[in-house]
């Protein structure tokens, strides 16, 4: 839950992966109620069309004149819940690309701005399940976080059984509204990032590429500059979450896995050997020193941005 909150404060899109029934959809629905913002849910299926997400022009007659009127799709909400996103075809998945990056959609040459704040919270099943389509790399890169949802421990299951009833929605009272959420997002953007921390982020992301570190020996493609920006934004949001006005090496290390795991593509040999992006990142954190230069002895020397 903390990672989801950090992702929202960082204005990022979040992908939740796990087996059916683990509460991924409930988490997203509960978040929308707690933040008191609009949410629209789309169940992704193989026959879903791009227009079912972005909206379509509808021919209407008014005063004897026929005109196309744009009918907004479910993407026009503060939160769009893309449920089981990898069950739709790649063409339909790609309909979200412009919305996720530019926070707008273009239909028949006309551009329509999306509400603010806007972010996509998507759920997907592991690709080993039948009827799933891997997300395109370009779309994966637009998700700030990919969070693996694991099975629920026995003690948590006990509390669920005692406090929940199947088919009954839990009562969740709003704790924020849209304007207050926007103000918190701006506060996260204003969190300072010292130059030594920015340097650490740059060296970490660069080290994900083949030939740049020992840890990246089995990597085919490393993380993009967008990943570096996302890592900085997530570190800032975590610092705000913990009541600090500047981010630290610890913040970077706390969010590096959900930011980078889905952006590292291993080569065929590494996959056959059982390597995982998570293992590569663990090795990177051990291999790349946090401090590449002496720590500053004053605030002015820290070059805080």
Q: Which residues fall in each region the model found?
A:
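Canonical AAA+ ATPase core
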Residues: 60-65, 88-92, 100-191, 236-241
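C-terminal engagement/docking regions of AAA+ P-loop ATPases
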Residues: 210-305
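Conserved alpha-helical scaffold flanking the Walker A/P-loop in AAA+ ATPase domains
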Residues: 3-6, 60-81
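Walker B catalytic acidic pair
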Residues: 18, 83-84, 95
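P-loop (Walker A) phosphate-binding loop of NTP-binding proteins
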Residues: 19, 53, 123
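Conserved beta-strand position immediately N-terminal to the Walker
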Residues: 14, 80, 118
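Walker A/P-loop
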Residues: 5-46
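AAA+ P-loop NTPase domains with strong preference for DNA replication initiators
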Residues: 155, 162-247, 272
């Amino acid at each position: 839950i903390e990672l989801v909150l950090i992702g929202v404060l960082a204005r990022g899109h979040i992908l939740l992966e796990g087996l059916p029934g683990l509460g991924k959809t409930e988490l997203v629905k509960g978040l929308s109620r707690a933040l008191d913002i609009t949410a629209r849910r789309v169940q992704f299926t193989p026959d879903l069309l791009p227009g079912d997400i972005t909206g379509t022009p509808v021919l209407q007659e008014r005063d004897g004149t026929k005109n196309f009127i744009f009918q907004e799709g479910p993407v026009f909400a503060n939160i769009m819940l893309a449920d089981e996103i990898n069950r739709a075809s790649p063409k339909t998945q790609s309909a979200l690309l412009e919305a996720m990056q530019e926070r707008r959609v273009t239909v028949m040459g006309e551009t329509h701005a999306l509400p603010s704040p806007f972010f996509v919270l998507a759920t997907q099943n592991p690709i080993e399940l039948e009827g799933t389509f891997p997300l395109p790399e370009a779309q994966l890169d637009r998700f700030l976080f990919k969070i693996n949802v694991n099975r629920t421990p026995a003690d948590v299951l006990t509390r669920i059984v005692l406090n929940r009833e199947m088919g009954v929605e839990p009562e969740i009272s709003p704790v924020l509204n849209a304007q207050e959420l926007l103000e918190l997002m701006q506060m996260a953007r204003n969190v300072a990032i010292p130059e030594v921390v920015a340097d650490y982020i740059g060296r970490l992301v660069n080290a994900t590429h083949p030939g740049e570190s020992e840890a990246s020996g089995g990597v085919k493609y490393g993380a993009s500059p967008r990943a570096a920006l996302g890592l900085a934004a997530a570190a800032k949001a975590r610092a705000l979450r913990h009541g600090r006005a500047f981010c630290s090496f610890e913040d970077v290390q706390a969010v590096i896995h959900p930011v980078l795991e889905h952006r590292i593509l291993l080569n065929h040999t590494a996959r056959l050997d059982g390597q995982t992006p998570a293992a590569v990142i663990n090795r990177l954190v051990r291999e790349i020193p946090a401090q590449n230069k002496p720590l500053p002895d004053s605030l002015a020397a820290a070059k805080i941005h």
